[in-house]
Amino acid sequence: MPSNRWIKNALPGALGILLFLLIWELLGRTGVLGLTWPPLTSVIATLSEPSKTALFLRATSASLTSAGTGYLAGGALGLVAALAGHLIPTLQEGLSRFAAVVNSVPPIALASVFLVLVTTESTPTAVAAIKVFFIIFIAVQSGLRSATPAQHDLFTSLGTGRFKRLWLLEVPTMLPVAMSGLKIAVPVALIGAFVGEWFGASRGLGVLILNAMQNFQISMLWSAVLLATLVSLAVYFILTMVESIVRLRLT
């Protein structure tokens, strides 16, 4: 049955997460790694403190807004660039090199540049967009090339035009690969936003992480990191479900 199969596939991952959480708590309780590794229960207690809940919610909302806007902008730019290179072969090599060069720039260096070009509040979005652009560009570019020669021969024999072939053949074969790229881009967008927030943003999880490091607030630091991880995993899980639906519709 599908439900039994789903449970069977999910069980190893769930057990692995549970084991990791137990080890985290044990290491924190025993103090093997020192004061900088607090117990998981202490981190959760910090997250649930009424005086800090509003702070965490505001920071999460700010980071999600920056990362989400950058994710959408970078994804759209990557999609358009990949389609342009696919439809106009003379642009392909130049676009690929441009994407590779942009991706090779470290996020901290990008944030420094954008700090001069745009406002401090826009820097997290800009960094996230640039890092997402490369992932989506490569995913869409690879997906558009994934149709087999036999499939292309069939459409050629039917006299299908270029744009009709793109819509009926290349886009459907591209979607599963693009969905994988969209999943991979989620943590990248969040990391880009966090790094951008370190350069003068007024709020965000990146700001909380930086302030906690500077003031040696260990529980606050781990709480912000845990919250960022949970947000990333939640979005990743949603996109995984969407990917499964897309694959079922295309098979």
For each predicted feature, which ranges?
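C-terminal transmembrane helix and the adjacent membrane-cytosol boundary/short C-terminal tail
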Residues: P89, R145, P176, W222-T251
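Transmembrane-helix boundary motif in ABC transporter permease subunits
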Residues: T69-A99
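Transmembrane alpha-helical segments of polytopic membrane transport and secretion proteins
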Residues: M1-L18, F237-T251
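Short cytoplasmic-facing helical segments at TM-TM junctions of multi-pass membrane proteins
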Residues: A139-I184, L205, I209
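Transmembrane alpha-helices
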Residues: A126-I130, F163-G196, W222-S223, L227, ...
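Glycine-rich helix-loop "coupling/hinge" segments at transmembrane-helix boundaries
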Residues: V116, L144, I191-A228, R247-T251
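Periplasmic/extracellular loop-to-transmembrane helix junction in inner-membrane transport proteins
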Residues: R5, R29-L72
